[in-house]
């Protein structure tokens, strides 16, 4: 048999095997478009705007359907009812973390966000408990955020009303908050180590949100054998790991088990207690990955939302004027905003909710996986199947939010101007995998934005109608365009 014949037979066998596997799986799974061998439905998906493709498929196949992103099936949940039924009503069964190959290659399943099974349960439980011990949800963490808000204002004053790109400054503020919780550090906004660390975090988010990364995660074999920006992710993560290991070593040398200072101290104490336990989850690897998760989620989510908020406030100056009028009336100019103010500021609260709804920061959420075979809406979903939830379909639901593509704080106000809650407000996801730092994130958004608007007027360099608010990347996350503005002291 010559080489050509052998290759043809091998390729044909692989295609037939792929077709057979897909056929047997598809008989049990929810409906969906017919996949091609090996590449699945990939050519039918717009990798620059996956959520838009999912909406298109949902019109044909309904709120629960199957796509093959490569050779593996992925169940898609579209719309509030399907997502609620899965993540809340069947939360435990949908609590697995779906495969995310690019990250798994480096973190090896450690940490909080991408771990599974007992490791995930243990780390999530530990994190929630010690966030409480460190004052999250209490007055002392509010004091810390207020202090950082004043540092942020002082840094913005240094721009002296000149045009500036706010990205770096808005990165530093939330980073300082989460770093003070994790290893009790407060960095100067010009600190080179912190800026380098944040550059790595920012670069990874941009790469992960690129169309190329959607290709890599669907075809994991590309990761090792093809050149591309995806290799930069591993280098950046390894840099961050080495930086954090130094911080951990410093903590080990100064640890006082009777007086824990921060998240790392609590972890090291737990590590000592678990020394005699077989297969303990409290390794240094797990700690470094957990801190990366906390800093990545706690900094990038916040700074991107703040950047988007300022862009939208310049685009819609009438909204800014209403918020500043409410700040003047409720808080005034002679004290710092506090969380008690929020209940007296329905328009400001509605504006912040609308920013999060409108920008739709993580359009398809992080992938879930079912932890056991499950019958869901008369379909059989095998254990381990990846599940994607379209948060876009909830946050931009036209029945709940009329004209969802419009930025309108009225989406969260009743006819009397009071704040109106919505079950469809799911920017932090829902269920067992919902963001552990949601409370802290809400606090920072309110205190940072009100403090900025209390002290400055926002001046755009272009006319409001010329401001473009469309995301420049819309993959893993929706990222706003870069822009400049002037912070004019008020």
From Swiss-Prot:
In the record, which positions carry Dimethylated arginine?
Answer: 144
Q: Which cofactor does it need?
A: heme
SUPFAM superfamilies, per this entry?
Cytochrome P450
Taxonomy, top ranks, is: Eukaryota, Metazoa, Chordata, Craniata, Vertebrata
Protein name per Swiss-Prot or TrEMBL: Cytochrome P450 2C7
Q: How does it sit in the membrane?
A: Peripheral membrane protein
Entry similarity comment: Belongs to the cytochrome P450 family.
Q: What class of enzyme is it?
A: oxidoreductase
Which residues make up the binding site for heme?
435
Q: Name one GO biological process term.
A: response to peptide hormone
Name the principal localization, coarsely classed.
Answer: endoplasmic reticulum
Enzyme Commission identifier(s): 1.14.14.1
Does the keyword Metal-binding feature in the UniProt annotation? yes
| Record's function text | Cytochromes P450 are a group of heme-thiolate monooxygenases. In liver microsomes, this enzyme is involved in an NADPH-dependent electron transport pathway. It oxidizes a variety of structurally unrelated compounds, including steroids, fatty acids, and xenobiotics.
This protein's record includes keyword Endoplasmic reticulum: yes
Taxonomy, superkingdom = Eukaryota
Q: Which GO terms describe its cellular component?
A: cytoplasm; endoplasmic reticulum membrane; intracellular membrane-bounded organelle
Gene3D superfamilies to which the protein is assigned, alphabetical: Cytochrome P450 (1.10.630.10)
Where in the cell is the protein located? Endoplasmic reticulum membrane; Microsome membrane
Q: Which InterPro entries match?
A: Cyt_P450, Cyt_P450_CS, Cyt_P450_E_grp-I, Cyt_P450_sf, Cytochrome_P450_fam2
Entry keywords, A to Z = Endoplasmic reticulum, Heme, Iron, Membrane, Metal-binding, Methylation, Microsome, Monooxygenase, Oxidoreductase
One GO term in the molecular function aspect is: iron ion binding
* Induction summary: By growth hormone. P450 can be induced to high levels in liver and other tissues by various foreign compounds, including drugs, pesticides, and carcinogens.
